[in-house]
Amino acid sequence: MSDKDKKFILWFDQVSNDDVALVGGKNASLGEMYTTLTGKGIRVPNGFIVTAYAYKYFIEKAGLLSFIENELKDLDTKDIKNLQKKGKAIREKIIEADIPKEIEEEIAKSYKDLSNAYKMEEADTAVRSSATAEDLPGASFAGEHETYLNVVGQKNVFEAVKMAMASLWNDRAISYRVDKGFNHFEIALSVGVQKMVRSDKGSSGVMFTIDTESGFRDVVEIDASWGLGEMVVQGKVTPDAYLVFKPTLNQGFPAIVKKSIGSKENKMIYSSDKEKPTKEVEVSEKDRNIFVLNDEEILTLAKWGLEIEKHYTERAGKAMPMDMEWAKDGITNELFIVQARPETVQSEKKHNSITEYSLDVRNLPAGRQEPIVVGIAVGTKIASGKVHIIIDVNKLSEFEKGEILVTEITDPDWEPIMKIASAIITEKGGRTSHAAIVSRELGIPAVVGTGNALSKLKTGQMITVDTSNGTAGNVYDGRLEWQEKIHDITTLPETKTKVCMNIGSPESAFIYSFIPNKGVGLAREEFIIVSSIKVHPNALLNFESLDSKLKTKIEKITLGYENKVDFYVDKLAEGIGQIGAAFYPNDVVVRFSDFKTNEYSTLLGGEDFEPKEENPMLGWRGASRYYDPKFKEAFKLECRAMKKVREQFGLKNIVALIPFCRTPEEGQKVLDIMKEEGLERGGDGPAPYQASATSFGSGFKVYVMCEIPANVLRADEFLDIFDGFSIGSNDLAQLTLGLDRDS
């Protein structure tokens, strides 16, 4: 027995990850970081811990053990009313009891010492529960126990500590322990009392060193919103989301491969009301429409995330993706890490097979092809069922197995019915909200952050929830038929041929990267432009001259961007970058845009810049557009995007592909424009690129589509200026045989 085993109080610098049995997973991790990582520049606010021994001492001295044992004798967690009754009785008994004086005295002294350390009369603190089996792989305890923010004053700290201890017996915590096979009395609860970061005046969020949807391990995922972090953790807001690519970040590149702006309607701040120390307020329209973090802050957090992951990986002797909470002090503008724990959902999955779900709505009547609700997809599955709208937690017992839960947000109190739902839809929240985390753990589809599900759906309505299409989650009216196909990737044979993939949506790239491959043979820019940009490039280049109605529509799409051209470049670069990152360091062949005039016309503002052609298949398309004065500036934006991917993201594995190039002379004109924009064939950019074993060589390569008979007849001339061909069999067949593929 160590000298720490019988302590009521331990400080962060006295504990490490070896002390989970004494202080719980969350507090052990805080101690580990505070002791080992603050010296590396990672800021962690200080604090002290009321130990698990103190909890056990309190329960025993207050005579609560026999009462709890008696309450649990006829516990039935499948009976929600029974569960609620038992949990409430135990919690009330704990809160009514007095904390022993010997523990109170030590808490009081420690709180005074913490306040003095920060030169405050009474420090504002975060009081967090930490169970002794918490945050172990296989047991996420996602929000099962309580956190109290802006706890100020000795008396309030006493009360918060006691309520945190009582939260070991929350309904969801009891249910979770039963589901996971934990013995109730083998788990104790410690309480961390940590100096608050003034993120109420700044911002906060969560960070994962793994993609939370696919389990792809080479990215850092960061969510950010204004105010205190509980809004993000509880899923009460749709936050900004950022992705940073680890391998090239480690090489020194500012590799932010994705930035998406969230709605961030509300934030949590300090309140002057002593009974309610925090309150929710609306975020100003200006702050809703800007990114919470700048690039420097995103990169700082990502580097900290890598350092923390590296430390925990070395300590565990195996890969240890991490789940962290961060906060930015609005007074000092400093960033802090306030929690870190192992990620317990995706990191535990084995990627031996890929189940592909697909839903084809094209054969439905015209009125039913469009989704009735759209939000952020969680998972990749499809489910049908009857809607059950629940707003009040007291109505949970009315929910029936197989129904689809529709609500504003979820918190751990909802987990008993989430376990029996076929799908979940929420008005608010992002990919790291409570609803999203639990849905992934349960393996059911969810659509979060819809904004209008409660007004669009009705209880009893039959719907189909589709999360199989990347980041967008779609909800359709009625029960629709879908396909499900399982691919066992362990049985795929080794091949001598370099088998590359065709990738459409960047959002699916991380998942498909688990299939054995040698890179990407074709990634089309058109998919990125249609799904992420939606606006004709010339409309963005000529934004100021557009009519007011069109400008208003474009403003909604380009939130966060004053310069509309930057929006086009950034979103195109992000789409290319995600695909490049997913298959790095293997080659990823990206084809410049090959919309025909009728397809370009469907983009917002497109009709003003596209001619009407009788046969667009043979018209103004491919390379002929790129040097035409009417489109040349738009093509330069594509070049800027590709340059950004290679030189800023560090993804030198990107290969350019020119479509529908009729003559070598036309090809040379395109190459000249690319060179003007800093994309010179054979160039490597500002840093060395090590070609992988499966790469087709080093240096910036430019291929051309072989899809016109002239490409075949003049192949040697084309290969004098290009590095290779990609055969486009559809167009080559129609132009050779005189058939129209659109007829």
List PLM regions with ranges.
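N-terminal beta-alpha lobe that positions the nucleotide/phosphoryl donor
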Residues: 1-192, 289-294, 301, 309-313, ...
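Long, charged amphipathic helices and adjacent flexible linkers at domain junctions
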Residues: 72-75, 85-86, 107, 178-183, ...
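Conserved alpha/beta-domain cores
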Residues: 122-126, 131-141, 148, 186, ...
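Extended active-site and interfacial segments that coordinate phosphate-rich ligands
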Residues: 142-175, 202-273, 338-372, 420-427, ...
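Conserved metal-phosphate-binding beta-hairpin within the catalytic cores
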Residues: 143, 317-344
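Amphipathic alpha-helical
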Residues: 150-188, 281-308, 313, 334, ...
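Conserved catalytic alpha/beta cores of large enzymes that bind or transform nucleotide phosphates
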Residues: 219-323, 327-330, 362-384, 392, ...
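Acidic, glycine-rich flexible loop/linker segments
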Residues: 343-347, 372-404, 408-523, 527-544
